[in-house]
């Protein structure tokens, strides 16, 4: 993927989190910092700045600092988990994340983060009205955009069984998500970001 394609890919994923040209002044005020943050993240990523490095099998991700993700989650953790009234269900259950091979991890993290971006973050974004919450929420979303943009899972035929195994894990997660009411599912998915980050950090290397 060349420089121009990478920029287009990043902007396509991030567009839902930045204001439209006709946004009101109050809306603009709410989202200007998160979008500025995304711009800085984008520039550091395409200009070669590096943070910690993730190795999801053959897929390497640079320019993302795990501590920033954790800080963003901790800022909204109590709010998200306090709103989760369904304690008997879990989306990121053991069958989804347990014993994932290195080769399988690239496919699984790609599908999970894309789902969070296109379904969870996108639909929850309009419900986030507090500036402090919105900033943390956007930090998570913007970093997920950067990670997804660098993941290029192999589509070769010999990887079919690994790709299929990762897909079946993802379907378990999505099925659990769809069994809940929309609001409850979005809240639970956000409240389980710590489970996702803990799993991802297993593939982080200095």
Swiss-Prot record:
Q: Which GO terms describe its cellular component?
A: extracellular region; extracellular space
Q: Where in the cell is it found?
A: Secreted
According to the record, the signal peptide region is 1-51
Induced by what? Upon influenza virus infection.
Task: Specify the superkingdom.
Answer: Eukaryota
Q: Does the keyword Phosphoprotein apply?
A: no
Q: Name one GO molecular function term.
A: cytokine activity
Among its keywords, does the record have RNA-binding? no
* Keywords assigned by UniProt, alphabetized: Apoptosis, Cytokine, Disulfide bond, Glycoprotein, Isopeptide bond, Secreted, Signal, Ubl conjugation
Which Cys-Cys disulphide bridges does the record give? 59-106
UniProt PTM: Glycosylated. Ubiquitination at Lys-122 promotes proteasomal degradation.
Q: Which InterPro entries match?
A: 4_helix_cytokine-like_core, IL-10/19/20/24/26, IL-10_CS, IL-24
Task: Tell me a GO biological process for this protein.
Answer: positive regulation of cell population proliferation
Q: What is this protein called?
A: Interleukin-24
Where is carbohydrate linked to this protein? 85, 99, 126
Q: Which gene encodes it?
A: IL24
